[in-house]
Design a protein with these regions (language model features):
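Sec-dependent signal peptide cleavage junction
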Residues: 28-44
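Surface-exposed amphipathic alpha-helical segments
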Residues: 65-67, 169-200
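Conserved polar/disulfide-associated segments of primarily extracytoplasmic proteins
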Residues: 70-166, 170-172, 177-179
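Extracytoplasmic/secreted proteins, especially bacterial periplasmic and envelope-associated proteins
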Residues: 60, 111, 115-119, 184-191
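Bacterial N-terminal signal peptides
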Residues: 19-31
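N-terminal secretory signal peptides that target proteins for export/translocation
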Residues: 1-12
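N-terminal "mature-domain start" segment
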Residues: 40-76
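Extracellular/lumenal ectodomain signal focusing on beta-strand-rich modules
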Residues: 64, 131, 145, 194-195
């Protein structure tokens, strides 16, 4: 028969074992987050700055990503620059464009976002809107954010579009990737978006 001292000793060991198990489990659950934070920190040390005074934009991007300056115009919008990841055969990209809305005096952010969604429906096959809001932030300004999918040449793409108004311009960052790559590059895209500035 166990005496009180023996029971107390067993209980203490049991409590210590359970406590140790909780600590170990907590550490293991935090490991993926910790590794992600290390990856982001390493990536942040290898960022280059892209600045274009003509368009009044500035953004940081990973040094191993490709930068393509475009300057092509489609209607009232100008494609300023595109950033591409280094992965071979990747279809992911971050495109920055500036839309001149001087002919649309008085248009609100919500109206612009709705018009943009309407245009996308007309332009893309199998367009499906996942979410849309006008309470996001880009470069310190109120912004709209739309997430949607569409099909192009039998490939389904997922897109994230964020746009903010300043004066007679709307500054748009559009991230596009195949469904198999979208989540892979999303943290990097979010990091780039956070560095975006309007300089004029």
């Amino acid at each position: 028969m166990l005496n009180r001292v023996g029971v107390k000793s067993i209980m203490n060991k049991l409590v210590l074992s359970i406590s140790a198990l909780i600590v170990i489990t907590s550490c293991l659950s935090l490991a993926p987050t910790f590794h992600k934070q290390i990856a982001f920190a390493q990536q942040a040390t290898n960022l280059l700055t892209y600045e274009n005074s003509s368009y009044g934009i500035k953004i940081q991007y990973p040094s191993h990503w490709e930068k393509q300056e475009n300057g092509t115009k489609q209607g009232s919008a100008t494609d300023a620059v595109t950033f591409l990841p280094p992965t071979i055969n990747s279809n992911a990209s971050l495109d920055i464009s500036i839309d001149d809305i001087s002919d649309e005096k008085g248009i609100t952010l919500a109206q612009y976002a709705n018009n943009s969604i309407g245009d996308l429906k007309q332009s893309f096959k199998d367009f499906k809107l996942i979410s849309s809001n006008t309470n996001s932030v880009l470069a310190g300004l109120s912004a709209y954010k739309s997430i949607y999918t569409h099909t192009d040449e039998n490939t389904t793409f997922k897109d994230l579009e964020v746009g903010a108004m300043k004066g007679d311009r709307v500054y748009i960052l559009a991230y596009e990737a195949g469904l198999n790559e979208y989540d892979k590059y999303l943290p990097t895209i979010q990091q780039l978006t956070n560095t975006f500035q309007i300089t004029n």
